[in-house]
Amino acid sequence: MNRHHDLLTAGSGGDTMDGIDQAGENRCSRWFDQMPERAARFFKQSERPLVIVSYAQSLDGSIATYDRKPIPLSSHHSMVLTHRLRAVSDAILIGINTLIIDDPLLTVRLVEGNNPCPIILDSRLRIPAQSRVLRRRGHRCMVAGTIGPSHERVAELEELGGEVIHCRPDPCGKVDLVHLLHQLGRRGIQSVMVEGGGEVITSFLQSRLADHLVLTIAPRFVGGLPALGRLAAAPLSFTDGFYHCCGPDIVFFATPRWHE
């Protein structure tokens, strides 16, 4: 068991679990209540934010139709849990494709709590000027791109109230996620909730940067776009896993176990 795993599971009261426990409301509440302390402990030792990957999929693993039209998967009950996670996260991150398709606000609405800082992964700074997340009150929207600070698009976004984070490109020309997380750490962000879409979720898992997973499974078949792309040759396993029945949905909580 490596240091990274020890750090994430410290105080959780369990080692690797062969099975998955069913949890009641009390255990779920403790998980959310302990998130800020867990994130602060992780941040102090790693100097980067704790990353919680959270998304909803159908029983057949779809997150959208094949023509990329969003479909409502989460019930109201599981959406409340999603908003609880937003409320205990310092920031919430999505990719530019999700923003263009959904134009979300990324705020906390179904529970009491503070809104997380919105972060958009947008290598080429394609975010539309009319995006709601740029115009909402509160935190400035952070846009992570690979375009240099002298580009005219940077000035346009900053004039709209956004903050452009200049990141190194990875080998594919996209935002280097490790570099981004360390830049967020320097800004004092201790936890980041990654909500999508599938390409972004896959990138965090491929890079072994997902520290916790919260997966909502809806009792539907869609036959659409898969939630995940190719991850690695070895299957990904988890520790400290438990699930909670939330209305018609099942919400799965776990810590990825990265094999050396």
Model-derived features with residue positions:
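Enzymes that bind and transform nitrogen-containing heteroaromatic metabolites
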Residues: 2-260
